Curated annotation (Swiss-Prot):
It comes from Wolbachia sp. subsp. Drosophila simulans (strain wRi). Pfam families: GHMP_kinases_C, GHMP_kinases_N. The gene is ispE. One of its GO terms (biological process) is terpenoid biosynthetic process. This is 4-diphosphocytidyl-2-C-methyl-D-erythritol kinase. ATP binds at residues 100-110. Belongs to the GHMP kinase family. IspE subfamily.
Length: 288
């Protein structure tokens, strides 16, 4: 048996535009995805050859709400990857959850990305096939395989990796406790005008802060209509010393604030946590 202990970093959408909708119902997006040191931890065990693959299991530990052990992103990724395993085997995964679920931080997508990355390398699966598997599991999973700053287009399959990250890496994440949002439900309420596609180039990387100030999260107002408290979270982050930019991540409910220094980020997290005990607060660093 082979055993691996791997991290699944939190995903943050620095901006998210909805640019179109396909006849299939899928929305086409553009966005800048980054990943943080805040991580789930996975223990992945691969059995000896000729093990019964249908005995593969996933167990979630420390999750704030119950996750179905049979129907989840990790099990879906495992089952798809097993089709390309060189021998019949089984996989068991234990996931220690530190990233809030259903919160716009890619907790499930990052777990699946870590599984795709680990088993893909072990079984030497072609990267094209891995990308197809990742997209089949979920729209955010392709970006989560490498967990590096990336400009994302389409459903989530078009990736342009950021060569030079020109932003501070000090971040505070805030989420109202016991508040969750369904990604499909939030997207289903997007009925407004689509955003114009961005002409992405290397020049955009030179001043990412300028780019962020010219962009937004098209799902933010929709999410606020479900959870008005999101607006309070953003204004609280904006009011902290050293705050550079604050907005919602993904389809919510989590929000992020970028800060000019680690000291100010840590102070902001402490301050917000004291004033708002009903909010989950975490200061962390972006992975660049």
């Amino acid at each position: 048996m082979k055993s691996f202990c791997v991290k699944a970093p939190a995903k943050i959408n620095l901006f998210l535009h909805v640019v179109d909708k396909k006849e299939t119902g899928y929305h086409l997006i553009e966005g800048l995805f980054v990943f943080a040191n805040l991580s789930n931890f996975l223990e992945i065990k691969v059995g000896e050859k000729d093990s019964r693959y249908d005995n593969s299991t996933v167990e979630f530990i420390n999750s704030e709400s119950k996750i179905n052990n049979q129907y989840n992103t990790v099990m879906k990724a495992v089952n798809l990857l097993l089709r390309h395993a060189p021998v019949r085997t089984k996989v068991t995964v234990k996931v220690v959850k530190n990233i809030p679920i259903a919160a716009g931080l890619g907790s499930g997508s990052s777990d699946a990305g870590a599984v795709v990355r680990t088993l893909g390398k072990l079984w030497e699966i072609d990267r094209t096939i891995l990308n197809e598997i990742a997209l089949n599991v979920g729209a955010d999973v392709p970006a989560s395989v490498d967990s590096k700053p990336v400009f994302v287009r389409g459903i989530g399959e078009e990736l342009c990796h950021i060569k030079k990250f020109s932003l501070p890496t000090n971040v505070v994440l805030v989420k109202p406790k016991k508040r969750f949002l369904s990604t499909p439900e939030v997207f289903s309420k997007h009925e407004g005008k689509f955003s114009e596609p961005i002409k992405w180039s290397d020049d955009a990387e030179k001043d990412l802060l300028k780019l962020l100030k010219e962009t937004r999260n098209d799902l933010q107002e929709i999410a606020i209509s479900f959870v008005p408290e999101i607006k309070d979270v953003i204004s609280t982050l904006e009011s902290q010393e050293g705050s550079i930019l604050s907005r919602m991540s993904g389809s919510g409910v989590s929000c992020f604030g970028i800060f000019d220094s680690e000291e100010n980020a840590k102070a902001a997290a402490v301050n917000i946590g004291k004033k708002q005990p009903e909010w989950w607060v975490c200061d962390t660093q972006l992975i660049v």
